[in-house]
């Protein structure tokens, strides 16, 4: 079981700061979901260093032109599974 699931749900203007917080807290085995405007930060240096970053299918439509090898688009059902498979979930807004 992974340890922490980070849900980055911040408005675009606050996403840089939210990702900085995640970067400071992130440990091996943790996962990150970019939601809403935060998905536009898919090319952020920290995000690119992750083996995998999750984006909801609806949010992925906004970044369709941006290719990222570590991006995994997920349905709401898969999102629910992710939440249940982690011992804690932290939302950054």
Predicted features and spans:
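Short, glycine-rich nucleotide/cofactor-binding loops
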Residues: 4-19, 31
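Short, charged, surface-exposed secondary-structure boundary motifs
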Residues: 16-17, 62-68
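Short, solvent-exposed amphipathic alpha-helical segments in soluble enzyme
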Residues: 21-26, 48-50
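Short, well-ordered alpha-helix to beta-strand connector turns
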Residues: 29, 50-51, 86-87
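Short internal beta-strands
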Residues: 32-37, 52-59
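N-terminal beta-loop-helix "entrance" segment that forms/cooperates
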Residues: 38-49
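Long, charge-dense
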Residues: 43-44, 59-63
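C-terminal structural segments of small proteins and small subunits
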Residues: 65-93
